[in-house]
Amino acid sequence: MRDKKLETKLRLVTLQLENWKKLHDLITYGLDKAKPIISTEQERQFTDIRANLLQEIEYVLRELGMLSEASGKAMSVLQRGVSVRGMRELSNDEVRRLETDWNSVFTKLGLMQGQLKARRKELAEQTVFDFYLNR
């Protein structure tokens, strides 16, 4: 048995997680002062990923029922990290807050993905008769 709403939510959370991972890679690169100069291409990638997250995060969190618990931290990360180059100018406290907030959002999205996958597996093992019987 398949649930279209469940599949949609799973797709949404998977895409969000991929974008949060890409954002993390660029943030980490920006914070590493030993790395070479930040390229225009890296800044463009960062801006594109950040724009995608800004456009989609509220919708995705609302669809997943996580708006109240993750929206503030997500916006904190997206507002604090305005460019890869700007990462190098953050104070140690700002970096810690950024990392903590990023981890919080990423963890919540990961947990949601795990719950959705478990529900998908549960549904896959059900027959149509079982599904309607257990409603």
How would you describe each model-predicted region?
Residues 1-135:
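Conserved non-transmembrane functional hotspots
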